[in-house]
């Protein structure tokens, strides 16, 4: 009986660490953290992935109620959250780009309630949905889980992990929030700016025409038309953002 209890305690102490890292990743990654993936599904997925990775390596037995155990809890949460945050940058870039497009079209007040992001413009929500479909089409969910499981070999549990290079990489990659949003929105914003300038010139030349009465619906229609015409290039840019995110995730793990 005592031998059985000792084996159960040892199993708990070894399974705890990979499960903490996997759970932290699932809570912060863009696809697995959405409201459609319920807490039960996330817990079940975390347990399943933990059992998958358990036979692949020799796990250290660390008591979580010691100083070393508390440090290890912090490190596993840090690694899981960091890997999820690297992917979350892509969705943040899409929201920034969607907000810029909505403001140019005059739809900045047309918001939707997103359970993960709060109030976001409808254009941004549309881009996030497209991004999720592209992510699944690229097989990103499989690649991300593979990288997560590989992280246990590259960033082993029980060893000291240098946090500074990982934080610097995250800060460097977070610049893509604004750069990626600008790459997505700039063609449409430039076209709408030219239309706005044209309307302003017409209004200045003939004030009696009252161009602003039709200017607002015209800007919305032009914005929708430009968005539809730009969807192929936007799709390629979203695909490029995901591919860059996978590369950065590999750099964080030391693969690239």
Label each region the model flagged:
Residues 1-256:
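Hydrophobic alpha-helical segments and their helix-loop boundaries in membrane
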């Amino acid at each position: 009986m005592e031998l059985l209890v000792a084996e159960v305690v040892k199993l708990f102490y070894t399974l705890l660490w990979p499960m903490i890292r996997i759970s932290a990743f699932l809570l912060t990654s863009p696809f697995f953290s959405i409201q459609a993936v319920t807490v039960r599904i996330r817990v079940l997925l975390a347990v399943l992935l933990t059992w998958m990775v358990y036979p692949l390596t020799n796990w250290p037995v660390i008591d979580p109620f010691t100083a070393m155990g508390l440090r290890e809890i912090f490190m596993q949460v840090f690694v899981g959250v960091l890997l999820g945050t690297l992917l979350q940058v892509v969705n943040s870039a899409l929201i920034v780009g969607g907000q810029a497009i909505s403001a140019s079209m005059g739809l900045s007040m047309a918001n939707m309630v997103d359970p993960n992001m709060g109030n976001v413009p409808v254009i941004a929500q549309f881009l996030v949905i497209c991004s999720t479909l592209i992510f699944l089409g690229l097989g990103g969910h499989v690649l991300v889980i593979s990288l997560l499981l590989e992280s246990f070999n590259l960033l082993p549990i029980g060893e000291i992990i240098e946090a500074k290079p990982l934080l610097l990489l995250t800060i460097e990659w977070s610049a893509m929030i604004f750069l990626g949003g600008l790459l997505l929105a700039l063609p449409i914003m430039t076209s709408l700016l030219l239309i706005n300038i044209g309307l302003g010139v017409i209004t200045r030349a003939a004030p009696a025409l009252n161009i602003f009465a039709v200017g607002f619906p015209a800007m919305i229609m032009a914005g929708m038309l430009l968005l539809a015409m730009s969807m192929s290039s936007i799709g390629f840019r979203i695909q490029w953002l995901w591919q860059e995110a996978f590369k950065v995730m590999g750099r964080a793990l030391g693969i690239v």
